[in-house]
Amino acid sequence: MRAFDLVREWPASNTSLCAIDRHGVAHTFGDTTRTSRIASVSKLITAWATLIAVEDKSTSLDAKVGQQDCTLAHLLSHAGGYSFDGTVPIVTPGRKRIYSNTGYELIANHVEQVSEISFADFLREAIFEPLGMAKSFLNGSAAHDIVSCVDDLAELALELRNPQLISAITASVATTTQFTELEGVVPGVGRFDPCNWGFGPEVHGAKHPHWMGSRNSASTFGHFGGAGSFLWHDPTSNISCVGLCEVEFDAWAMHHWPIFFDSVIDELSR
């Protein structure tokens, strides 16, 4: 892919990438078997596993988790009222989109309680083994400490495109905006009103400037991580992209990633 030529301008070493075209064909760059911590892209996996628990009736989106009147649905969509890392809620649920690692740790604790196994084991049984993500595992917080590789994350992207582990209806709900019209901040990116988010994935919407590209449709959903990781799927073009870098997300990514993503979409849409 010619789009991969743009990566030479990135200040990131050992970059590995996978772009999946509308036919499901994967185009790769770099060592896609190399493992690293995927940072907040972990939240996509944690959320998908939680939705599996919801579908098998172990819990429900209306289950009370955390502060008073807070539900699993609130926490999955960063509407639970918890700050980035604080354990004390700062607003009531459903009032603001406050991106929260704490919320995802509460989710993992809840799934552990209802499943009666560790969350690491739950991820392995519910996600990693069924999808063949052989190099992936949880090594700490469910919010940001999953270790994986691009090959494994490409399998996750295929699941997000064509869900097999959860129903198409649940997947559609999860990848569209929940608790609409909430304003909030995407850390490292900016404040948006509304700040669109699903049950796990961020939804592109009309956010600008943004880490996604201008060619990404409003319905594009995914996540990036502070370790220089990203995964998104664009339902309009039916194109997905996954990447792991060894340079933390910063201004360089806000500049280079959208250019690269636009090039990927342009090239694979032909």
Description of each model-found segment:
Residues 1-37, 95-96, 112-117, 121-124, ...:
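Catalytic loop of the DD-peptidase/beta-lactamase superfamily, centered on the K-T-G motif
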